[in-house]
From Swiss-Prot:
It is an enzyme of class 2 (transferase). This is Molybdopterin-synthase adenylyltransferase. ATP binds at G41, D62, S69, N70, L71, Q72, R73, K86, D130, N131. Keywords: ATP-binding, Metal-binding, Molybdenum cofactor biosynthesis, Nucleotide-binding, Nucleotidyltransferase, Transferase, Zinc. Belongs to the HesA/MoeB/ThiF family. GO terms for cellular component: cytoplasm; cytosol. Its cofactor is Zn(2+). Zn(2+) binds at C172, C175, C244, C247. One of its GO terms (biological process) is Mo-molybdopterin cofactor biosynthetic process. Disulfide bonds: none annotated.
Length: 249
């Protein structure tokens, strides 16, 4: 396991002193390789905290460019980066947050084989997209590679987070997505409140840190839902579907 430098020990001191986290937890983060797919609102929120917390290697995957309409909620981007690839804008912002980590941008749309190959080289994947077909592609690749997937979604004033670890008898994302099909609304169509994006992206980062450092209980086997209108959280148990095309028998 990678050792922490003196500068890193100072930087991450508030995490290291947490009961049960210690140097081992911080070194596990430094060793980790996390793939973040989608550098919109959720991806911007999640990666800020993953970078700040000391995740050693972040791979940023997106094929979109920054537009003015993104700036309300996509906090790594700015007026100065409008027109740039999102992964490059995000990389530069994250490098300013933490110069001790490695950030690799991938400005591309990948086919299934390339996606699965990329996933297999990582410790964990964050799904920060707003596209059901891409979400299903990520789920299939993560299931094949047995790499945990943390899925987040936010629209209007509601958001949700789910962790998929692909252990025996646990559900996968397709068990969920087959319930509502391919025609889920997006933020472009329905709108979204900016701070809600920050809440859900931060929850994704927290779940990632817990998984990587074996710290706490991950939100697997359930959907954690947040209603920003009433400031209430609730959970719904997610069952594995025997007829699922990905994880079913």
């Amino acid at each position: 396991m990678a050792e922490l430098s003196d500068q890193e020990m100072l930087r991450y001191n508030r995490q290291i002193i947490l009961r049960g986290f210690d140097f081992e937890g911080q070194e596990a983060l430094k060793d980790a390789r996390v793939l973040v797919v989608g550098l919109g609102g959720l991806g911007c929120a999640a990666t800020q905290y993953l970078a700040g917390a000391g995740v050693g290697q972040l791979t940023l995957l997106d094929f979109d460019t920054v537009s003015v309409s993104n700036l309300q909620r996509q906090t790594l981007h700015s007026d100065a980066t409008v027109g740039q690839p999102k992964v490059e804008s995000a990389r530069d912002a994250l490098a300013r947050i933490n110069p001790h980590i490695t950030i690799t941008p991938v400005n591309a749309r990948l086919d299934d084989d390339a996606m699965t190959s990329l996933i297999a080289g990582h410790s964990l994947v964050l799904d920060c997209t707003d596209n059901v077909s891409v979400r299903n592609q990520l789920n299939a690749g993560c299931y094949t590679a047995k790499v945990p997937l943390i899925s987040g979604a936010a629209i209007r004033m509601e958001g949700q987070v789910t962790v998929f670890t692909y252990r025996e008898n646990e559900p996968c994302y397709r068990c969920l997505s087959r319930l509502f099909g391919e025609n889920a609304l997006t933020c472009v169509e329905a709108g979204v409140m900016a701070p809600l994006i920050g809440v859900i992206g931060s929850l994704q980062a927290m779940e990632a840190i817990k998984l990587l450092a074996h710290y706490g209980q991950p939100a697997s086997g359930k959907i954690v839902m947040y209603d920003a209108m009433t400031c209430q959280f609730r959970e719904m148990k997610l069952m594995r579907n025997p007829g699922c095309e990905v994880c079913g028998q």
